[in-house]
A protein has these predicted regions:
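Gly/Ala-rich beta-loop-alpha elbow adjacent to hydrolase catalytic centers
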Residues: 140-149
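Conserved alpha/beta-hydrolase
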Residues: 84, 91-113
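Catalytic histidine-centered segment of alpha/beta-hydrolase-like enzymes
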Residues: 259-269
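Short beta-strand/loop motif that positions the catalytic acidic residue
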Residues: 219-221, 226-228, 232
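Short alpha-helix in the alpha/beta-hydrolase fold that links the catalytic acid
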Residues: 236-244
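Alpha/beta-hydrolase active-site loop
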Residues: 116-137
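The alpha/beta-hydrolase serine catalytic core
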Residues: 12, 159-222, 249, 280-286
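An N-terminal hydrophobic leader/cap segment in hydrolases
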Residues: 1-55
Length: 286
């Protein structure tokens, strides 16, 4: 039995007599987020072009990145166990079109050390980036970064257009993958939920609804383009279908095949759709 399986077995056993302790131990493992992903070799040239600065947010010195001359900023929000350089192929396209991409390494990711942050930390970071760079011509979010992007726009961040790639719709998805990896049983998952509620949200049990991208998504007033692969093994395609239904007529969903969770970032057709939409073209119907 490997370490992950042993850890899950131990947490499941502990959750019966001591759910609070099991939940707290699981939370501490969850918040680590895994090892920092290095910049991929094929992305190093784009990464090296960025102006790198830091933002002091909570306990973190957050690494931020900006490309271009500052005109027409486009915010890029990466996903779980990722980093800003994930967007390198899109950054190249946007620079060629005269846009100025802006991004950051989330807490516990990339060059930003420490533990992982929450949706509230992401909102603060995005707000500071808007203060520095101005209204965004577009916001592009991938995976968990898509959920963070929707929440930020609901909370008053200004942007003209929104692109959501392999999007997380339900906030509970932030722990679902972790729980599945450790094979946590329902009692241990419930203990983890409670520990997260207490540690980050003052015991508020409504966060799983309030911070879901589907919550009040109908209040979004900007055009939205969603792209999601039907074979995504990490975030089911159904998550984007749910988000599409919640947003309503301002949104369109493009379903790809064979790209899985990360292939959209380098797929030429997907990049064409994204950049055309950012430039003001109507969202494609399929």
């Amino acid at each position: 039995m490997n370490t992950i399986a042993l850890t899950g077995t131990a947490l499941n056993a502990l959750a019966l007599p001591a759910p609070a302790l099991a939940g707290e131990l699981a939370r501490r493992l969850w918040v680590r987020g895994g090892p920092a992903r290095p910049v991929a070799d094929q992305d190093r040239d784009v990464h090296a072009l960025a102006r790198v600065e830091t933002l002091h947010v909570g306990e973190w010195e957050v690494a931020t990145y900006a490309w271009g001359d500052g005109a027409r900023p486009v915010l890029l929000a990466h996903g779980w166990r990722s980093r800003a350089s994930w967007f390198a192929p899109l950054v190249r396209r946007l620079l060629d079109l005269g846009y100025s991409p802006v991004s950051w390494d989330a807490p516990g990711h990339g060059a930003t050390g420490g533990r992982s942050g929450t949706v509230l930390d992401a909102l603060e970071i995005i707000g500071l980036l808007q203060s520095r760079h101005g209204r965004f011509n577009a916001v592009v979010g991938h995976s968990l970064g898509a959920l963070f992007s929707v929440h930020a726009l609901r909370e008053g961040i200004d942007a003209d257009r929104l692109v959501l790639l392999s999007s997380v719709a339900d906030f509970e998805t932030v722990i679902a993958g972790f729980a599945a990896e450790l094979r946590l049983r329902p009692r241990a998952v419930a203990a983890l939920r409670t520990a997260i509620e207490r540690r980050y949200f003052g015991g508020d049990t409504t966060v799983w609804t309030r911070f879901s991208a589907t919550h009040d998504a109908h209040t979004l007033t900007l055009p939205v383009l969603l792209l999601h692969d039907r074979e995504d093994p990490m975030i089911p395609h159904a998550q984007s279908r749910r988000l599409l239904a919640a947003i309503g007529e301002r949104a369109r969903l493009v379903t790809t095949s064979g790209l899985r969770h990360n292939g959209i970032r380098t797929d030429a057709d997907s990049l064409d759709r994204i950049t055309a939409f950012v430039q003001g073209a109507p969202a494609p119907l399929s």
